[in-house]
Amino acid sequence: MEKRTLLAVILSITVFYVFSLLFAPEKKPVQPESTGQAVSAPVSAGQPVAGGVQPSASAPSLPATAQQQDVTVRTGLYTAVFCSRGGALKSLTLKNYREKNLPDAQAVVLGSDADPSALTFSTRASGFNLPEGAPFVADATAVTMAGGEKKQLVFTHNSGQGFTVRKIYTFSGDSYGIKLDTQVFNNMAVPLVGTVQQVMTYPGLVKAKDSRFETAGSYLFSDNSLESDKLKDVSSASKLYDKNLQWSGFADKYFLTAILSEGGSIASVELRKNGAGFLESTVSSPRITVTPGQSVTVVHRLFVGPKDIDILKAQGNSLEQSLDLGWFTVIAKPLLYTLKYFYRYVGNYGVAIIIITIILKALFFPLTHKSYKSMKDMQKIQPMMAALKEKYKDDREGMNKAVMELYRDHKVNPLGGCLPMLVQIPVFFALYKALMFSIELRHAPFYFWITDLSGPDNLFGQMLGLPFVIGPLPLLMGATMFIQQKMTPSTMDPMQAKMMLALPVVFTFMFLNFPSGLVLYWLLNNILTIGQQMYINKLVND
């Protein structure tokens, strides 16, 4: 029985690990009947949409065409470059984040002037003639503000067909959030009916990678559920989401670009692979009706910045759900909040990890004690178990009955050593996710040679031509795992025991490329477990 329970534990851990990394729930989006059409209740002419401005009878007078121009916006947090093509965002440089963990490394740049996929929040329309990439004219060549200040940048498109579209970006010097008012002025003699669309293209402003650990792609929050799509998941046939949309955007491991609904201003989001092979997201407003001489405003909020859980939560609309921590999110996010709480006091995320590890070990001590005692009890009755197996080697039913009587007589629960450990598995995976995908640990130093808790321990670099770096932390982790294994009571036969000795070696190689913050947690957890076992041994022997 002990062999079977041990095997069950190992298989459970393996299945949880592989399944949580490689698989996600299947999404069931609605297939659209036609491209780019939003379905919603009509809005009365002359009324603002989703908290927009009051109706206006006159549109700004500008030429129908204008020379392409770029506008630079500088705040305390970022430098953004907008262009007149679609009134779109081309690139954004995050001043507080660096590409590499080096003193002279450049700041993180999202997007590129040379990348045709980088135009984000480009405006077009369905139902009236505003094509993608339509020329807009900016009211400034540069906008600069300090923290706490608010300033605007206005792009205007004169269609030459009796209507004008104006995009008003409102920036805050101390926020990654941007307000976008899209105004449609109708100077024609007939009503103007259609939908306003904001277009984003992947990879656009995110770092496009595709692996188990880099979950870059499209994310949106629809009907209280997070939906995600990678480029490979979307064909030329589009996917349509149109239920209770809160936000939509593109994200990678650490950064997010999103458009947020303001009072229901997102009616649908359509995903498709465009002719250039990029993943395109079209965010459509409810259908608007602009009567002659009036205007309608569609309001959105934008976000381009780090996936810091506090920053995301402050934006509202459940934007913090973009920090997808897998099946154990309900445990992982409280652990992440706890990690940040201790960081505020100690000023070092490595120390905060140590504090959390000690607290978790103390909380689980009763379970560990019970598990260890149960294994000790099982070890004591092994000679009697062996005798029963020999006695009933040709009578399986008789052997099972005798074994159960042996358990009952000695008050031993064969699952007593397994169940307490299974309870701790979700906590481990939750902490694993929190440490693996937390931007807080990105380039965060610990002490001594560990300068980046989000990267592997690479003190010794690549040795002996191996394709990975080597450092002391994973080696120490493997050594402590071996010591812990030798101290743990075992009822396995010699062959199984020898096979189990390979586990520390396997885990050491696995952890060579893991974030050093996670290896630090595992190492300290092993050390505390060794201390626990020494203490419990003393209690049991006494």
UniProtKB/Swiss-Prot annotation:
Its main location: membrane. Residues 33-64 are annotated as: Disordered. Residues 54-64 have a biased composition (Low complexity). One of its GO terms (molecular function) is membrane insertase activity. Pfam families: 60KD_IMP, YidC_periplas. It is found in: Cell inner membrane. PANTHER family: CYTOCHROME C OXIDASE ASSEMBLY PROTEIN COX18, MITOCHONDRIAL, OXA1. Interacts with the Sec translocase complex via SecD. Specifically interacts with transmembrane segments of nascent integral membrane proteins during membrane integration. This is Membrane protein insertase YidC. It comes from Pelobacter propionicus (strain DSM 2379 / NBRC 103807 / OttBd1). The lineage of its organism: Bacteria, Pseudomonadati, Thermodesulfobacteriota, Desulfuromonadia, Desulfuromonadales.
